[in-house]
């Protein structure tokens, strides 16, 4: 067979892989092969392109790997959803489109780790800005010419967004006008990755659209990576399968580096399948050990969240939009004008608070939604309602990813070990009680009806714990399973290079050493922008001097 050679092979066309593909091919002499196990991002499919349809891709298998965890021991042994994006755009093709970067202190904390000194907020902010075009223009914190379109909430959006923010302020928490600006702490409007024409701004739309016409970029969809090929400790290529036929094995060789961007679930899985991981485990799976690296698949983290739902006394919620007979008009307005309910992910307000003084920066996140429904579109309440999604941000619980089979189409064993520490339970109890306090402020008096969920009869610690155990769900933020650093459990260095190997990097949410305070997509893109400059041998962007808020 005719084996082609490229300067770089990127595994996974997701939030990070597409950034690398676009940036590396800006150098006209650099050839790149981008491998994606899923299909194209079909632009005529409203399920991925219409922001308000965000629940649809999670219900199917075309765009979602639809992993399930092992029974979670502290969650009544539930097997919990772990949706991950499949197709050009990866999880940016199916996520909730919240543009939230996390707290500056997250990055300051990363930078205290040996080898990560250049991951401070000042080092990273220029790369957040480089990636972004914000619809109201740039400033010290925001970009105005990047590939990711960011939309800000507009006047005239749902009255419940404003009432919920006002209630948070009345409950004694700060107000902030920009959750990605000087001060994350507090309640305020939430930005979203949506284009000016009301379309989802995935990294396929942002980055690949500007790169896919380049002769030095080859994009293969329906190409599932079997393993990375090595000559001793040097990555020399990738073996992959086209379509669903395991006999249809292809190989591509690499001159410079293999860049693994398959995400926090699949990146450790591919490393293990390729012989890089904990040696005793690899031998037990009958895999030849290329390199003993015990941290591969360890340190897995996620955000867990729950919904607090209320009836709405006035007919101002989005409940009518769930009725089939109202949807054609909503769809038409979105399709032809790029406006209306269809053009928003409906997460237009939220916030970050500290549930107690033991935390130096926020540990609880809120997303407000002007309808009562599950994130994946199930269990909609059959009347006007609204809800707060609330969860803790930096749980001490740690999980792991383990291969179950050498079959490249088999899902791995995933265990997040949710709620395994006393801090977890304390934070979730506090979150429920604080949310109830917020919901009972005067700003919500005209709207707030009875509490639907958890239900006001649940009051004791034991009752609240039981609710969390049975009803908390993932926020779809798996991360940290191939962490950056220099300690014995680190998988990559501060530039994403796999320890002990040559010509191999991991660049995606798996390399975060600690999960951030907020949604992951914006930071995953930033990481890829930053490492792209390092791969290209370019000088880092000048450090930012923009200040950030630290609670006294």
Curated annotation (Swiss-Prot):
FAD binds at residues 7-36. Its EC number is 1.1.99.1, 1.2.1.8. Keywords: FAD, Flavoprotein, NAD, Oxidoreductase. Belongs to the GMC oxidoreductase family. HAMAP family: Choline_dehydrogen. The gene is betA. Coiled coil: none annotated. SUPFAM superfamilies: FAD-linked reductases, C-terminal domain, FAD/NAD(P)-binding domain. One of its GO terms (biological process) is glycine betaine biosynthetic process from choline. This is Oxygen-dependent choline dehydrogenase. PROSITE patterns: GMC_OXRED_1 (PS00623), GMC_OXRED_2 (PS00624). It comes from the Bacteria. Pathway: Amine and polyamine biosynthesis; betaine biosynthesis via choline pathway; betaine aldehyde from choline (cytochrome c reductase route): step 1/1. GO terms for molecular function: betaine-aldehyde dehydrogenase (NAD+) activity; choline dehydrogenase activity; flavin adenine dinucleotide binding. GO terms for cellular component: membrane. It comes from Acinetobacter baumannii (strain ACICU). Gene3D superfamilies: FAD/NAD(P)-binding domain, Glucose Oxidase, domain 3. It holds the Pfam family GMC_oxred_C.
């Amino acid at each position: 067979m005719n084996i082609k050679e490229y300067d770089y092979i990127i595994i996974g066309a997701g939030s990070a892989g597409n950034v690398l593909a676009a940036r590396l091919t800006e150098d006209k002499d650099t050839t790149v092969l981008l491998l994606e196990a899923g299909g194209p991002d079909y632009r005529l499919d409203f399920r991925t392109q219409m922001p308000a349809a965000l629940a649809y891709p999670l219900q199917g298998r075309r765009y979602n790997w639809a992993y399930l965890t092992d029974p979670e021991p502290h969650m009544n042994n539930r097997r919990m959803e772990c949706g991950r994006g499949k197709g050009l755009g990866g999880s940016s093709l199916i996520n909730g489109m919240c543009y939230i970067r996390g707290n500056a202190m997250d990055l300051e904390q990363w930078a205290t780790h040996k080898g990560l000194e250049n991951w401070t907020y000042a080092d990273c902010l220029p790369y957040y800005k480089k990636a972004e075009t914000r619809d109201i223009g740039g400033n010290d914190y925001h970009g105005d010419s990047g590939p990711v379109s960011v939309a800000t909430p507009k006047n005239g959006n749902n009255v419940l967004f404003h009432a919920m923010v006002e209630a948070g302020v009345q409950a004694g928490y700060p107000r902030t006008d920009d959750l990605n600006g000087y001060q994350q702490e507090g309640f305020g409007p939430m930005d979203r990755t949506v284009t000016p024409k009301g379309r989802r701004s995935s990294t396929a739309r942002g980055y690949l659209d500007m790169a896919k016409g380049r002769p030095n970029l080859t994009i293969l969809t329906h190409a599932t990576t079997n393993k990375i090929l090595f000559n001793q400790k040097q990555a020399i290529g990738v073996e992959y399968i086209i379509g669903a036929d395991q006999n249809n094995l292809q190989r591509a060789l690499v001159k410079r580096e293999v860049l693994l961007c398959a995400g926090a679930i699949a990146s450790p899985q591919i490393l293990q399948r390729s012989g890089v991981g904990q040696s005793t485990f690899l031998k037990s799976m009958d895999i030849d050990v290329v390199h003993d690296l015990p941290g591969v698949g360890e340190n897995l983290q996620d955000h867990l969240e729950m919904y607090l739902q209320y009836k709405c006394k006035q007919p101002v919620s989005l409940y009518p939009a769930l009725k089939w007979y109202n949807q054609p008009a909503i769809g038409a307005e979105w399709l032809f004008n790029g406006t209306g309910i269809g053009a928003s992910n409906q997460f237009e307000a939220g916030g970050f608070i500290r549930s107690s003084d033991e935390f130096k920066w926020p540990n609880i996140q809120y997303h407000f939604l002007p309808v009562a429904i599950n994130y994946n579109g199930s269990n909609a309440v059959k009347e006007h309602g609204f809800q707060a999604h609330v969860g803790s941000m930096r749980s001490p619980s740690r999980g792991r990813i383990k291969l179950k089979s050498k079959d490249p189409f088999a899902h791995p064993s995933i265990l997040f070990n949710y709620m395994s520490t006393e801090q977890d339970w304390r934070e979730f109890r506090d979150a429920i009680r604080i949310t109830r306090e917020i919901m009972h402020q005067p700003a919500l008096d005209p709207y707030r009806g009875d509490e639907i969920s958890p239900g006001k009869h649940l009051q004791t610690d034991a009752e609240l714990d039981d609710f969390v155990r049975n009803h908390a769900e993932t926020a779809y933020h798996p991360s940290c399973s191939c962490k950056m650093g220099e300690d014995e459990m680190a998988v990559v260095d501060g530039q994403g290079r796999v320890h002990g190997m040559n010509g191999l990097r991991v660049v995606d949410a798996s390399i975060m050493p600690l999960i951030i305070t907020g949604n992951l997509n914006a930071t995953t893109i930033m990481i890829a922008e930053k490492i792209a400059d390092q791969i290209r041998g370019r000088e880092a962007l000048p450090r930012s001097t923009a200040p950030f808020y630290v609670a006294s």
